Regions:
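Mixed-charge interfacial surface used for oligomerization/domain docking
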Residues: 10-24, 30-208
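Extreme N-terminal basic, low-complexity initiation segments
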Residues: 1-4, 8
Length: 208
């Protein structure tokens, strides 16, 4: 997993104290499984707050949706895949020459799964949108929100945004583009574009 849960880094007493503080201050403690999806969940929770939903209703919604946030992403910079052990040095060198883009997702445990590879950015965008059609709520009739994050490749993010908006005409608003944070970017590298959306339950490792 690319991140450690807070409970894994604390002793039992510290974790129990945090839970007690949350209970006393009206703060809900939720294990989001993976940090990359927080923006979409927080945005949805804020919408429910504005609709007048209670804390319990919002918490239940987040708990239900946390495994339904999909993360589809591709990368054009293979040396970071080599550094993280997802690709051998020889494969990274050959892939760079051929313009290979790994297509990745997060599984139900929040682990990065490289499930396909294509040649060129256009094919990477097309494969990402194709996968989104298969997993998004109501398929091409998806009416939820979609976010895109990128690491120093705004043009690629904008091209992906255009493809997503063309494929999903009923989106809830314009696709929002954000920067990938420095911690995640240090793992994924520059040239990474990620698409976030609500869909079916994220599949475990070994599934498409």
């Amino acid at each position: 997993n690319s991140r450690c849960r807070a409970s894994d880094r604390m002793n039992t007493g510290e974790y129990t104290n945090i839970l007690q503080i949350c209970n006393c201050t009206g703060v809900a403690q939720i294990d989001d499984i993976t940090v990359e999806e927080d923006g979409l969940l927080v945005d949805g929770a804020a919408d429910l707050r504005d609709e007048g939903k209670s804390m319990d209703e919002i918490t239940d919604w987040v708990l239900e949706k946390r495994k339904k946030v999909h993360h589809q992403f591709y990368s054009t910079e293979l040396k970071f895949s080599r550094r993280s052990g997802r690709m051998s040095g020889a494969a990274a060198a050959i892939g760079t020459v051929l313009g290979i883009c790994p297509i990745m997702r997060l599984d139900d445990k929040g682990r990065i799964i490289a499930y396909d590879k294509v040649r060129g950015k256009k094919n990477a965008v097309a494969r990402t949108v194709e996968t989104m059609k298969r997993h998004a709520e109501n398929g091409e009739n998806y009416t939820g929100k979609a976010f895109i994050c990128h690491s120093n490749c705004l043009a690629d993010a904008e091209a992906t945004k255009a493809a997503v908006e063309a494929a999903f005409p009923h989106l809830n608003g314009e696709v929002r583009i954000c920067d990938i944070g420095t911690i995640v970017a240090s793992h994924s590298g520059p040239g990474t574009v990620a698409v976030f959306f609500f869909g079916d339950d994220r599949a475990p490792e070994g599934s498409a």
